[in-house]
Design a protein with these regions (language model features):
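A generic local secondary-structure boundary/capping motif
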Residues: 41-43, 51-54, 89-92, 125, ...
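Glycine-rich anion-binding loops of enzyme active sites
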Residues: 58-73, 78-81, 97-190, 194, ...
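N-terminal glycine-rich phosphate/pyrophosphate-binding loops that anchor nucleotide-derived ligands
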Residues: 2-93, 133, 168-174, 313-314, ...
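Small-aliphatic-rich amphipathic alpha-helix that forms the alpha element of a beta-alpha
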Residues: 76-102, 119-130, 205-219, 229-235
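Short beta-strand-to-loop capping motifs
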Residues: 20, 154, 306-308
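Acidic-glycine-rich active-site phosphate/pyrophosphate-binding loop
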Residues: 52-63, 203-209, 274-284
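Glycine-/charge-enriched secondary-structure boundary and capping motifs
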Residues: 1-13, 24-28, 39, 109-134, ...
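Active-site glycine-rich loop that binds ribose-phosphate moieties when present
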Residues: 151-161, 193-214, 286
Length: 329
């Protein structure tokens, strides 16, 4: 009997932790503006928002994004679901609705069976169907390692757009999913242990949270993915020219996350996140393990929004600009 294929063995990094480190990425894209200057580009590279937005008319903006990554779990179908959920989240994070998506697949065809690739695509298809988003083809590359995700196009009303730079001092900050999938995925890759709660979190669409945010009049927010809560909070603070305060005791975590950090299952991406934010973060004396959890590279994480939402956890607030971008209390 053939042993089941462990897809995570073919990944250098895992999920959103395989991103180019944030500091290096910002240097790489510095000074790169739009190919053609136009007032119809509502959101571009300026602040590193979750997607680009172009105005089609007074009532409609076109939202476009792409997101793909290496396996975070060994099950091909679940990986496809997670990657698709994560890609769709970028549109939801902008307050938009995804309409159509294309598969982005890299596959080592001489190493891994094509039947597994089909399972990955099936997972993405099922999530897109649940989201009411057309999945219409895509592009594939014969590559050394497996990677999968989606290019997604959606729409948003310009007056309902959620961006990083629209924060106001005094607003609460709410988080719609618990943290910890990064350290749990790292443990899964190392030991083969399964964490169903983490898979459930990563395959939960941010659709309902985004709808609640739009209904509540939220205009500032992002999703929490590869740069961790601290990294994404820092980007929001910088774009809005404010300070973000995070109440460490209020931040929710998945079961087993603290134990995973204690046992050393921390990805290189999470450690790089912590190094990146250290220069402009007041950690308030919290322990190293807590710092690592707040910097944990999430895959298909929740929304972080300036406002209160039903079912979300208030984890902090926006303050007038101070000495630090982020203050942990």
């Amino acid at each position: 009997m053939t042993d089941p294929v462990r897809l995570t063995r073919y990944a250098r990094g895992g999920g959103c932790a395989c991103k180019i480190p944030p500091g290096e990425l910002e240097k790489m894209v510095a000074g790169l503006g739009p190919a053609t200057g136009t007032s119809d580009l509502l959101v571009g590279l300026d602040h590193g928002d979750d997607a680009a937005v172009v105005r089609l008319d007074e009532r409609t903006g076109l939202v476009t994004t792409a997101d793909f990554f290496t396996p975070v779990v060994d099950d091909a179908y679940d990986w496809g679901r997670i990657a698709a959920t994560n890609a769709l989240s970028d549109v939801y994070a902008m307050g938009g609705t995804p309409l159509v998506a294309l598969n982005l697949l890299c596959w080592p065809r001489d190493v891994l069976p094509l039947e597994l690739a089909r399972e990955v695509l099936r997972g993405g298809q099922d999530v897109a169907r649940d989201a009411g988003c057309h999945l219409a083809g895509g592009h594939s590359v014969d590559d050394e390692g497996p990677k999968y995700g989606l290019a997604v196009t959606g729409v948003v009303r310009p007056e309902e757009l959620i961006t990083l730079d629209a924060g106001r001092a005094g607003l609460p900050l709410s988080l719609t999913k618990p943290l910890g999938v990064g350290v749990l995925n790292t443990r899964h890759k190392a030991t083969g242990e399964s964490f169903p709660e983490a898979v459930a979190a990563m395959t939960t669409l941010n659709r309902d949270a985004a709808r609640a945010a739009v209904a509540a009049g939220v205009r500032c927010g992002t999703d929490v993915t590869g740069f961790g809560l601290l990294g994404h909070a820092s980007k929001l603070a910088r774009a809005s020219r404010l300070t973000v305060a995070i109440d460490a005791a209020r931040v929710p975590y998945l079961a087993g996350a603290r134990e995973a950090v204690r046992d050393g299952y921390v990805s290189g991406g999470s450690r790089r996140n912590l190094e990146w934010v250290a220069g402009w973060t007041d950690f308030g004396g919290i322990a190293e393990d807590d710092r690592l959890l707040l910097a944990d590279a999430q895959t298909s994480g929740g929304l972080l929004v300036a406002g209160e939402l039903p079912g979300a956890t208030v984890v902090g607030e926006l303050l007038p600009p101070g000495e630090h971008r982020v203050v942990v209390r």
